[in-house]
Amino acid sequence: MSLIKFYMRVASLESGQISPNEGMVGIVDDDSDISILFADALRGVDGGISVFTFNDSLEALKHFTNNKEKYILVICDLMMPGLNGLDLVKKIKKLSPKTRTMITSGYEIEPGELQIDIKKGIIDRIIQKPISMNGLRQEVKNQINSCQLRINKK
């Protein structure tokens, strides 16, 4: 596990930006180059977030379980040894339904393949790799804003 902590300019929800509340973002990919690249890309995300990278899904699940109230987003590769990405996000959503989840894959995902899991709210977004770092930052901003708006409505 690696911790990469960023503190950046904080914007208000009124401006449509990320809430000032700090939260954890987990990146889970068995390819360490991808997880580090994704973590580096998140330096451009407004707000204070702590980014944790994992190359082992079971290690990620253990960390999430111990910190579930702090996680706002988990980005997870679909195809991994051991516990695959879909099974990991199912466990994450069971532990913390409010945590947003994004599945990434370098393999082509057939239309409708994961639609049931999206409709059930298990997967919040599917990202096809490769993705530009600007595209990743925007997707993360969207997911974090969605999570914060949902929390603030309660």
Predicted regions and their residues:
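Active-site residues of response regulator receiver
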Residues: 77
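Receiver (REC) domain active-site loop signature in two-component systems and cognate sites
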Residues: 80
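Acidic, metal-coordinating helix/loop segments flanking the phosphotransfer/catalytic sites
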Residues: 53-73
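Two-component/phosphorelay signaling modules centered on CheY-like receiver
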Residues: 32-52
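The C-terminal output helix
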Residues: 141-154
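Hydrophobic/aromatic residues positioned on beta-strands within the core alpha/beta folds
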Residues: 104-106
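C-terminal output helix
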Residues: 2, 128-140, 144
